[in-house]
Amino acid sequence: MKYDIIVVGSGPGGYVAAIRASQLGRKVALVERAEAGGVCLNWGCIPTKALLKSAQVYTYCKSAEHYGLTLAGEVCPDPEKIVARSRGVAETMSKGVAFLLKKNNIDLIQGFGRLTAAGRLEVDGTHYEADHIILATGARPREMAFMPI
């Protein structure tokens, strides 16, 4: 299939680029190997912030008297529920990204994208062409011998 633009990676850089290109009248596809929204939205930034919010609320409850409040009973964190809430937040946001892609007529291609030539991409055995390919795959930390993490 031929597109004007194919974006590889659906994180904050990728899905925003795809949406903007579509809004400008381009035929766009977005390739993602996992859930829409990428690592940041599904496993990094967003779930971490949800976990931190639970810790913040717990801290507020523990210091309720400083705010003129008396809580009846003990405030106890439930790790399973805290993690479930974090996963739920990430899932909701991922579905939101998928909705925005659909709303903007962007083809979401699930799979691992691999450049094969200029303007050509292969995703799990299927070949695609585009006038432009945007690589928005993010990064992974890498340990170097002279600078261990």
Where are these regions (language model features)?
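Beta1/beta-strand and adjacent pyrophosphate-binding region of the FAD-binding site
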Residues: 1-13
